[in-house]
Amino acid sequence: MRLYRDRAVVLRQHKLGEADRIVTLLTRDHGLVRAVAKGVRRTRSKFGARLEPFAHIDVQLHPGRNLDIVTQVQAIDAFASDIVSDYGRYTSACAVLETAERLAGEERAPMPALHRLTVGALRAVADGSRPRELVLDAYLLRAMGIAGWAPALTECARCATPGPHRAFHVAAGGSVCVHCRPSGSVTPPQAVLDLMSALHDGDWPAAEASTPSHRSQASGLVAAHLQWHLERQLRTLPLVERVYRVDHAVADHRISLLRQDVHRGDEPGDQLAAGS
């Protein structure tokens, strides 16, 4: 089979043998691809640094039986340095990558919309011009929409009666009317559901006008909805920093650990998840 070329986001990588790595890529035209990058752990590797997590690359691959082989790499966007320099950006970007991999589904199933959304989210997190917690929640809502899991926010998830409806139930699919409301539903302020709608629709002026309390509640609903559909918790979401007052000494220590992960090519957040 011939070589093929595609644009990709590097989701993660891990060691293989003495000098190689296996990289997991979300490509534009070929979906999820796992490939071997030979010799990238050697100091003279010509493209090792271009295969760090968070990188947006143009990559050429040779198809293999189980794993493809990376033959050429050109950097398109190098988001890693801006992301890793800040703990909050890093954890948010890690959640983006993990979500992308989970939602990509089977290998080689094209997901161009998810690829495009993931690149945009990483660019926004790295740029830092918008609150990272809002960028993450907007990404999660839109990614769930691509997967067909978007929560109902403006109509009843069960009977489609137009809203607004105050009750929200994850298993029911989002907002529910008084007639369909299951036991265990929560009743967040209407502003919380309005914020979720704004994030899903890209209404940034409305989203950025929200209060910290409403952002926190919206984040909780978004995370719960995603994890219910995934049927397991994301490793990275508990690490996401959504608090504005941070102990800078702790944050600096965490950043140093995260930089070590990226430098060594470990999966982002391994040391934090291990409690180091």
Curated annotation (Swiss-Prot):
UniProt key word DNA repair: yes
InterPro entries: ARFGAP/RecO, DNA_rep/recomb_RecO_N, NA-bd_OB-fold, RecO, RecO_C
Keywords assigned by UniProt, alphabetized: DNA damage, DNA recombination, DNA repair
GO biological process, one term: double-strand break repair
Pfam families (alphabetical): RecO_C, RecO_N
SUPFAM superfamilies named among the record's database cross-references: ArfGap/RecO-like zinc finger, Nucleic acid-binding proteins
Statement: the UniProt record of this protein carries the keyword Transmembrane: no
GO cellular component, one term: bacterial nucleoid
Record field: transmembrane: none
PANTHER family, A to Z: DNA REPAIR PROTEIN RECO
Record's function text: Involved in DNA repair and RecF pathway recombination.
Family the UniProt entry places it in: Belongs to the RecO family.
Protein name: DNA repair protein RecO
Species assigned in the record: Mycobacterium sp. (strain KMS)
The gene coding this protein: recO
